[in-house]
């Protein structure tokens, strides 16, 4: 018997809801939210677009263009949130400080936030931003799942070795509460694993397909 993951259908129905420059502009703090975070150019927008089978999140050759909290509705009570990208050198310092202030406010106050999916470029994992996010997740007991993106840029063996190395580093520094996988948007590698995490956090059960 086949099993259908209900999150797939919801993600395919994802629609842009609103953009917020600060927490006060966010949707009502109810239901379920999963936030997507990542350093600039880590493939965050591409991952979101792959999971939703759409071009919801803006991709750009200039990293760091996401300047707002962007909310996408899956249904009446479930949302995906595209958080501002960080770390791009050409973004003015005052703007970076503005992003950080409101990102911290969102992460620290949002009751409906069920987990954070953190994108790391598999070729350059565990940046200072990544470690900051891991520290926050540990301190707040927030579930975190890591996508090692752009896995198609490495050979299968090199990707596996990086996965094992990052897993070991995270286990030593942040415990067993963080899960991690390889991901490639163009190859759709790891998509099903990511869907399972989303379904679990959003409390959706797999349904048998008759």
Curated annotation (Swiss-Prot):
Binding residue positions for GTP: 38-45, 64-68, 82-85, 149-152, 182-185
The entry's keywords: Cell cycle, Cell division, GTP-binding, Magnesium, Metal-binding, Nucleotide-binding, Septation
InterPro entries attached to this UniProt entry: G_ENGB_dom, GTP-bd, GTP-bd_ribosome_bio_YsxC, P-loop_NTPase
Pfam families named among the record's database cross-references: MMR_HSR1
GO molecular function terms listed in the Swiss-Prot or TrEMBL record: GTP binding; metal ion binding
Coiled-coil spans in chain: none
Similarity-based family: Belongs to the TRAFAC class TrmE-Era-EngA-EngB-Septin-like GTPase superfamily. EngB GTPase family.
Function, as annotated: Necessary for normal cell division and for the maintenance of normal septation.
Gene Ontology BP, a term: division septum assembly
Positions of Mg(2+) binding: 45, 66
Required cofactor(s): Mg(2+)
Cellular component terms per the entry's GO annotation: cytosol
Classification of source organism: Bacteria, Pseudomonadati, Pseudomonadota, Gammaproteobacteria, Pseudomonadales
PROSITE patterns in the cross-refs: G_ENGB (PS51706)
Domain (EngB-type G): residue spans on this chain: 30-204
Keyword S-adenosyl-L-methionine applies: no
The UniProt record lists the keyword Membrane: no
Name used for this protein in its record: Probable GTP-binding protein EngB
């Amino acid at each position: 018997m086949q099993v259908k993951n209900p999150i797939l259908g919801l993600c395919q129905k994802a629609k842009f809801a609103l953009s917020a420059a600060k927490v006060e502009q966010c949707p009502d703090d109810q239901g379920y939210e999963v936030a997507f975070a990542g350093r600039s150019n880590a493939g965050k927008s591409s991952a979101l677009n792959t999971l939703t089978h759409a071009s919801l999140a803006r991709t750009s050759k200039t990293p760091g263009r996401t300047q707002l909290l962007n909310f996408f509705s899956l249904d009446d009570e479930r949302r995906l949130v595209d958080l501002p990208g960080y770390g791009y050198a050409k973004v003015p310092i005052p703007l970076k400080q503005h992003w950080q202030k409101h990102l911290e406010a969102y992460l620290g106050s949002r009751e409906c936030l069920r987990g954070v999916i953190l994108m790391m470029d598999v070729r350059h994992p565990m940046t200072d931003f990544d470690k900051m996010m891991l520290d926050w997740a540990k301190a707040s007991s927030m579930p975190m799942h890591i996508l090692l993106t752009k896995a198609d840029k490495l050979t299968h063996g090199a990707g596996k070795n990086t996965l094992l190395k990052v897993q070991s580093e995270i286990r030593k520094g942040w415990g067993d509460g963080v899960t991690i996988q390889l991901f490639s948007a163009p190859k759709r590698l790891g998509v099903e694993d990511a869907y399972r995490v989303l379904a679990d956090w959003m409390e959706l059960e797999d349904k048998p397909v008759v």
